[in-house]
Amino acid sequence: MLRAALPALLLPLLGLAAAAVADCPSSTWIQFQDSCYIFLQEAIKVESIEDVRNQCTDHGADMISIHNEEENAFILDTLKKQWKGPDDILLGMFYDTDDASFKWFDNSNMTFDKWTDQDDDEDLVDTCAFLHIKTGEWKKGNCEVSSVEGTLCKTAIPYKRKYLSDNHILISALVIASTVILTVLGAIIWFLYKKHSDSRFTTVFSTAPQSPYNEDCVLVVGEENEYPVQFD
């Protein structure tokens, strides 16, 4: 009974410890550096890139933005091995005609790019960007897409979760330490219980009544009485 009750006691503590260190919204998200990523594999028909973006905002995120070579490589590797995405992924980028530059939908700074070609003379109105999975390069394309085979979303880890206060760290440490202590204590109690049970079982048999005769003594039965005969 003790062994059966112990997991039920430890599970809430383990859940609390896991919640204390979890950074992404759920296990379906993947963390890299200070952000969480999810690939929505559902193919949808859209009228504009805003319809694609709504897929991400419905999950509390925005379309993907990429800010360094390491992040670009992480996305490529995860798309190939885990997400199994299409050959081209629509990036969360648009061309702003007001200042003639590309910008991210999530309002982050454009600190990195990986364009496969640069043509200053091309018309960039209604131009979006796509990540080519095989090469890892970006290419320009029309924003007026009719359908997408999957949407890649990204959200930043909240500041208050990324930099836990000292109290939260202490609570997490205490929860984990308590879990370990209870596990060890439960194992010790179970061991002592089993040892006590085995000892009592042995004592019962060791105190059972013994025959008053030894191996050299036989019982001779007469016609009227019984008496032991001892052989020398």
From Swiss-Prot:
GO terms for molecular function: carbohydrate binding; signaling receptor activity. Expressed at moderate levels in monocytes, myeloid blood dendritic cells and granulocytes and at low levels in plasmacytoid blood dendritic cells, monocyte-derived ma crophages and monocyte-derived dendritic cells, with no expression detected in T-lymphocytes, B-lymphocytes and natural killer cells (at protein level). Expressed widely in different tissues, with highest expression levels in liver, lung, peripheral blood leukocytes and spleen, and lowest levels in neuronal tissues, skeletal muscle and ovary. Glycans are attached at residue 109. Residues 23-168 are extracellular. May be heterogeneously N-glycosylated in some cell types. The chain crosses the membrane at residues 169-189. Residues 1-22 form the signal peptide. Disulfide bonds join 128-143. GO terms for cellular component: cell cortex; filopodium; membrane; microvillus. Potential multifunctional C-type lectin receptor that may play roles in endocytosis and phagocytosis as well as in cell adhesion and migration. Isoform 2 and isoform 3 are produced in HRS cells by a transcriptional control mechanism which cotranscribe an mRNA containing LY75 and CD302 prior to generating the intergenically spliced mRNA to produce LY75/CD302 fusion proteins. This is CD302 antigen. It comes from Homo sapiens. The lineage of its organism: Eukaryota, Metazoa, Chordata, Craniata, Vertebrata.
